Amino acid sequence: MLQYARELIATIMQKDPAAHSRWEVVLAYPGFHAVMIHRLSHWCWTQDWKTVARVVSHAGRFLTGIEIHPGARIGRRVFIDHGMGVVIGETAEVGDDCTLYHGVTLGGTSLAEGTKRHPTLEPNVIVGAGAKVLGAFTVGEGARIGSNAVVIKPVAAGATIVGVPGRQ
């Protein structure tokens, strides 16, 4: 857990010019807190401690304004900047080195239990403020989703998607 924290602190220091010190990140960055709390809640989820996982996740949402379902899989060095209102669903997967801005939703379009309902972000994806990525499909490595875009179809690696509905 400590290694994940160190990596995430270094990532935030690199990606956010407003971060002035490591202590500032540890004490005052809700995206850092949300990801670290998620690591604990996800571990509880994988141990089949579902209720404990949900309580830990709920505490994280209360403290940060960022809702990450304990079943979601979050990669290393995922940076949630200005995270208020971010929602990441149960079957979502966020690859290493992705960046999510405030108001992003990685949501589902189905209520079917036991199936993949949420998107998969491959490594190095950036999702702009207010964007909604909805459904069980993949956003390819290095893709960029513009602010307030609504994406409901797969996105090719390296593509830039904007608008409602999202298009290249």
Where in the sequence are the language-model features?
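Terminal amphipathic alpha-helical/low-complexity segments used for targeting or macromolecular assembly
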Residues: 1-64
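Glycine-rich phosphate/ribose-binding loops and adjacent secondary-structure elements
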Residues: 113
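Left-handed beta-helix
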Residues: 64, 69-70, 75-76, 81-90, ...
